[in-house]
Amino acid sequence: MSFRLILDIQDQMNIVRRLHRSARLGSDLVSGFKLKCGLELHTQLKTDFKLFSLSKTSFNEPPNSSISYFDVGLPGTMPKLNPEALRLALRLAVSLDSDINLNSSFDRKHYFYPDQPLGYQITQHYSPIATGGFLKLDSRYDGIESTKKDIRIEQIQLEQDTGKTNYVKFDGEVRIDYNRANIPLIELVTKPDFETIGEVVAFIKKYQTLVKYLDVCTGDLETGAIRVDVNVSVNGGNRVEIKNLGSTSEVAEALGYEYRRQIECLKENVSILQETRSWDGKSTTASRSKEDALDYRYVPDSELPVIRLHSDIKKQVQESLPQLPDAVVEKLIASPFNIELKHAQFLVNNKHVLSYYYNLIESIKDIDVKRANNWLFHEVFGAFSKNNLAFDPDKISPSSLARLLHLIFIEKSITSASAKILLGHLVTAPNSMEIEQAMEQYDLGKPTGVSESDIDEIVDEICTEIIAANPDVIKRIKDGKHKSINYLIGQAMKETEGKVSSDIFAARFKALIGT
C-alpha cells in the first residue's frame, strides 16, 4: 500500500470521526457542492417458477426445500428460460418506454462466493432485454422541487438472484439457503440524473408503485423484493457505490451521510476513492476499492439461445398494459370521481381496492359520488382500522355498500349513525351478511310501526329533557357558541340508539332553544 494511500485513509478516518461527533446529518444540499446520483434496482419477479429451472419460487418455505439440481450448480444440469420472467420484464420495459432489444442474450458473470454455487451468475451484460426509457417525476404527485423531471433509464436486464447467506455468530458457522438462488431478477440501471435526495426517494416510491401495479413484483423493500444500490458523486468527482439499501429511509440517510462525507473530503483536499461502501445505519464504511474490483470475465452463455423477438413486440405489449398509475391518478382526482389526491394514490397502490372502488361507483344509483367516496374512505376503512383489521371486501361487497348508501340517503330507512354502528358489526362478523339481514339482527333500522306524530312526540320529549339537564350548554348556545348544539344532538342520538336522524334533532333543538 502506498504512503499516499495510507495518508488518504487516515484523513478520511478523521473526517468520519468529525461527522460522528456532529449533529445527525440532514438531507439538505450544500451550496457549491452539486450532488450527482444514479440507482441500480434489483427487482424480484412475481413468477411461479425460477428463472432457469422448474423449482417453485418460495420465500417462506424451510431452507433448501425449494431447489433443483440446476439451482445448486450440479454438473450436467442445463438452464431453460422461464417465459413468464421474460413477459414481466417486457411489461416493465414497455411501461418505461424503453427500447426493446429484438435479439438479447445471456452472459456469465464469473465470481466465487458460497451463495452462487455455479461459480458465475447468468445475466445480460452485453445485450440486455431493453435500453433507454424514462420514469417521469411530477411535483404534483411526487413531492419533488422541480415541476417535472424525467429520470432516464440506462438499461434493463434479466438475471438470477443468489442464495441467502446467514452468519450464525454463536457457533461461527455460515449457513446458506438456496431457495432464493435462481429466482428471476430485473436489474434496472438509471442514468445519473438525480440532483437531490428527495428525487431519489420519489423515484424509488414511484418505481415501487409501478411494479406492484403491473404485477411484476410485490414491491417490498423490507423483504428484499427490491434492493437498491446508490452511486454518489459530488461536483463530478469519483463515484462511490453504496450497496443493498433496504428502505427509502435507509437510502435517504445513507445518501445524505455520503454526500456530506464527500463534501468534507473536498474541503480538506482529501482524495475521494472510487470504491464500494456499506451502510451500517450510522455511517458508510469502505468495503471494496477500485483496485480490489473483481474481473468478472464476462462471456456469452453457450447453453442459452439468443432471445429473438418480433418487431411488433413493443406494440403488442403496450396494448396489453393497463392504464398506468399517473394516468389513473389524474382520472380519479377529476370529475366524476373527484377523489382527494392522497386517496387516489392509495387506490393506485392497492389495486384490489381500486377495483372495489370502480365496482362501487358502478353500483350506486341516484347517490352523489362524493357521498360514496366519504363513506368508503372514512367510514368503511375506518371501521376496519378501528378493529385492527385489514380491508376485506368479502365483509362488505361493493354492491352491499351501495345498498347501504341507498338505504341511508334514498329510502332513509337507517340513519347515518346507525349505519356506522352496522359497519362495525359487519367487519367483525365471522360470516358475511346481507345489509337488511344485519339491520334486523342488530336492530339498527329506523323505528317501524310508529306514526310520524308519535315520532315527533318522542323527539319533543327527548329534546325537552336534554335541554332541562344541560343549562350551561344552552347558555353557551344563546351566547353565540352555536356548535355547542352538537353536544345536545349527540345525547339525543345516544338516547335513541341512532335510530332517529340527527337532522330531525338539530331542527327540534333549534326550535325549542330559539336560535
From Swiss-Prot:
InterPro entries: Asn/Gln-tRNA_amidoTrfase_suB/E, Asn/Gln-tRNA_Trfase_suB/E_cat, Asn/Gln_amidotransferase, Asn/Gln_tRNA_amidoTrase-B-like, GatB, GatB_Yqey_C_2, Gln-tRNA_amidoTrfase_suB_CS, Gln_synth/guanido_kin_cat_dom. SMART domains: GatB_Yqey. Transmembrane segments: none annotated. It catalyses: L-glutamyl-tRNA(Gln) + L-glutamine + ATP + H2O = L-glutaminyl-tRNA(Gln) + L-glutamate + ADP + phosphate + H(+). Its main location: mitochondrion. The keyword ATP-binding applies. Coiled coil: none annotated. GO terms for cellular component: glutamyl-tRNA(Gln) amidotransferase complex; mitochondrion. Keywords: ATP-binding, Ligase, Mitochondrion, Nucleotide-binding, Protein biosynthesis. Allows the formation of correctly charged Gln-tRNA(Gln) through the transamidation of misacylated Glu-tRNA(Gln) in the mitochondria. The reaction takes place in the presence of glutamine and ATP through an activated gamma-phospho-Glu-tRNA(Gln). This is Glutamyl-tRNA(Gln) amidotransferase subunit B, mitochondrial. It comes from Meyerozyma guilliermondii (strain ATCC 6260 / CBS 566 / DSM 6381 / JCM 1539 / NBRC 10279 / NRRL Y-324). The gene is PET112.
